[in-house]
């Protein structure tokens, strides 16, 4: 019972971390990375489809991504989708290859993105703390129903607190790493 609560909490906290990682990957730093464009939806025969499912995305150099559509007629819709994504990118097409040069980030944009990173990290921390609270409430219920002793409850709460502290430390590490990436010129 106690192990089930702890394991459930751990898996839910790890999902929160995974979600944060995904959100941070979407934010543009000064360097080219395929995850920057993977979430963009492209009109593929009237169906909104992720770019990664209609083309291959590669890093050409540190400031340029190249996109090779799997179908020739997808070049136009991919270009439009990138422009509509509001990432401040201007794709250039050369035959079947779409090159996306990444302009250097302005200081103002860097600060804005750093603020977004801090907000996303705070959302992840809150989610992890909510999971801890729910687990502790479940443990209190078990104790009220006399299924576990007070000592077992305290030990389990300590284990959940250690887990929470470790996950929040990981969130802080990911956020500070992303902020450092953003502020590097």
UniProtKB/Swiss-Prot annotation:
Its main location: cytoplasm. InterPro entries: Ribosome_recyc_fac (IPR002661), Ribosome_recyc_fac_dom (IPR023584), RRF_sf (IPR036191). One of its GO terms (biological process) is cytoplasmic translational termination. One of its GO terms (molecular function) is ribosomal large subunit binding. GO terms for cellular component: cytosol. Keywords: Cytoplasm, Protein biosynthesis. The keyword Protein biosynthesis applies. Pfam families: RRF (PF01765). It is found in: Cytoplasm. Belongs to the RRF family. NCBIfam families: frr. Responsible for the release of ribosomes from messenger RNA at the termination of protein biosynthesis. May increase the efficiency of translation by recycling ribosomes from one round of translation to another. This is Ribosome-recycling factor. It comes from Coxiella burnetii (strain Dugway 5J108-111).
């Amino acid at each position: 019972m106690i192990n089930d609560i702890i394991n459930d909490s751990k898996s839910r906290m790890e999902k929160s971390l995974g979600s944060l990682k995904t959100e941070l990957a979407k934010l543009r730093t000064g360097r080219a990375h395929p995850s920057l464009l993977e979430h963009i939806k492209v009109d593929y025969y009237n169906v909104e489809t992720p770019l990664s499912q209609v083309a291959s995305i590669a890093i050409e150099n540190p400031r340029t991504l190249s996109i090779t559509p799997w179908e020739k007629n997808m070049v136009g819709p991919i270009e439009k989708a990138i422009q509509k994504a509001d990432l401040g990118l201007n794709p250039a097409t050369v035959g079947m290859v779409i090159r996306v040069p990444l302009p250097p980030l302005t200081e103002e944009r860097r600060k804005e993105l750093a603020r977004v990173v801090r907000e996303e990290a705070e959302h992840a921390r809150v989610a992890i703390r909510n999971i801890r609270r729910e687990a502790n409430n479940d443990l209190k219920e078990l104790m009220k129903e006399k299924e576990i002793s007070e000592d077992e409850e305290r030990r389990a709460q300590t284990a959940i607190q250690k887990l929470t502290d470790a996950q929040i430390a990981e969130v802080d590490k990911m956020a500070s790493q992303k902020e450092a990436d953003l502020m590097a010129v």
